[in-house]
């Protein structure tokens, strides 16, 4: 990251040794780092994000990077390779929701979901084998976290369930993921602290 104020949003190691990815929300850039044989990282290769404010992301097992765009209200997908190649597949697919900050891909790689902190909602995308994205619901609302909802993060388990950390209502909402990507509410864990900021499922 060459910029002095990149405001990095997320960092993650890509599957299959494809390298390290960092989103810069302050510069609308995405950085990729390849691994050297000794485990250190090559210099960053910087790429322009398809939309403004790239934020949360996830990477499928086949190397498809899907990134939320918090200001644009959208998500984009990109192709990654072990040699550091980076190309846009689907650019800025809008969901008409506000502040889609965090994103997760299902374990089978078929769907991606964004947590829309400013709209009390979750948006779902179909993720095709070629990495292209298609919005599941025309209005962008695959699920709602209810009045005062503020989903800050999302996670999925290996049994086709999605969990949303709702800081507005201080709960963790659980949803079953249908065969076509629909989300059906199945649980709500109450009494969570106001300071909660992240969630993981396993």
What is each residue range found by the language model?
Residues 1-19, 49-65, 94-110, 142-161, ...:
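Beta-rich, blade/repeat-based domains predominating
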